Amino acid sequence: CSKAVDNLADRLQFDGFEDDTFEFQTMFDQNNPDIFFDDAMLSALISSCCFVLVTRGAGKMPEGQQRIRFQIIDGSNATGIIDDYTKLLTEGYAVLDRDENDNVKSWAYCTPGRTEVYVAEQPDKPIAVETFDSPYCALVPIIYRPDAKRQFGHSRISRACMDYAKSAMRTIKRSEIAAEFYSFPQKYATGLSDDAEMLNSWHASMSAMLTFTKDEDGERPTLGQFQAASFTPHLEQLKAIASMFAGETGLTLDDLGFFTSNPSSAEAIKAGHEGLRLTATKAQRCFSV
C-alpha cells in the first residue's frame, strides 16, 4: 500500500503562498520548510487527514517578530468539531506526547482564541495557556478528499487496497509452501520385494546413492518421479491481484514491479498514468496549494 501513497505524494509540490498579506511565508520558513509540506501531505494521504497545531515559539525573530511554531499531528492523535462552511475546527483535541507504552503524557485542548496544554500528572488543570484573537482553533486540519458524509476525508489506502494487499500476501505464502514440494518432487519405487527394508523418506530424499536389488523372481524395481508442481499459477494469481490493485490506485503494472517483455512507449506510459495525474490535481485542490 505504500506504493499507492508514495506515488501520489511524489506528484504533489508546494510552490508558496499567493497574495501573502499575512506573511505566511515568513512563518512557514521558520518551521523547516524543506520537509514540512511533504510530512503533512504524506500523513494526510495515509490517515485521510492530519493536523497542524499553531503555537508561539520560544524567542523572537531578528526583526523582532514573535516566532511561530507549526507542529504536525497525524490523524490518529487528533480530532475535533469541524465547521461545515470553512472546514476549520471550532473545537479540537490533540495528543502531544506519549510514553514508551503508548500512554498519553500530554495533550492540547483547543477552542477559538485559546489553547490549553495538559499533562497526565495534572489532568484537571492546564500547565500552559495561550490566547489569541481568532474565531477558530489553532489546530488546523489538512484533509484529503472530504465529502458531505466524511468531512475528515478519505485515506489513500482504501479498504480495497488493504484487501488486495492481504490477498497478495496469502498468495506469496502459498507459493512458498508449494516451493518445498516442487523443489523436491516426490519419487516412487515399484516392484520391490515384500522382504525389502523400508527406506526412511527423509533418508531417501537426501541420500546421494541408493541401492535396489532384484526381487526373488529376478524382476528389477521400477523407479519414477511425480511431475513437479508449477509456480506459474501462483505467479498468474499474483499478477491478477496486482492488476486490480493498479486499477484501484491509478498505478501501472510497471510501477508494481511486473515488467513486460516489450517496453511501453512514452505515450503508453503517459496514458497509463493519466488517472494518477488527475488524482494528483484533485489532491492539490484539496490541500489548497
What do the PLM-derived regions correspond to, one by one?
Residues 272-289:
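Glycine-rich and small/hydrophobic secondary-structure elements
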Residues 94, 221, 288-289:
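Hydrophobic transmembrane alpha-helix bundles
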Residues 1-144:
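Structured, mid-chain assembly/scaffold modules that mediate subunit interfaces
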Residues 128-275:
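Extended, charged amphipathic alpha-helical segments
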Residues 20, 29-36, 160, 164, ...:
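Short amphipathic alpha-helical segments
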Residues 41, 45, 53-54, 185, ...:
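General N-terminal targeting signals
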Residues 83-88, 120-123, 183, 237-240, ...:
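Surface-exposed beta-strand edges and their flanking turn/coil or helix-capping segments
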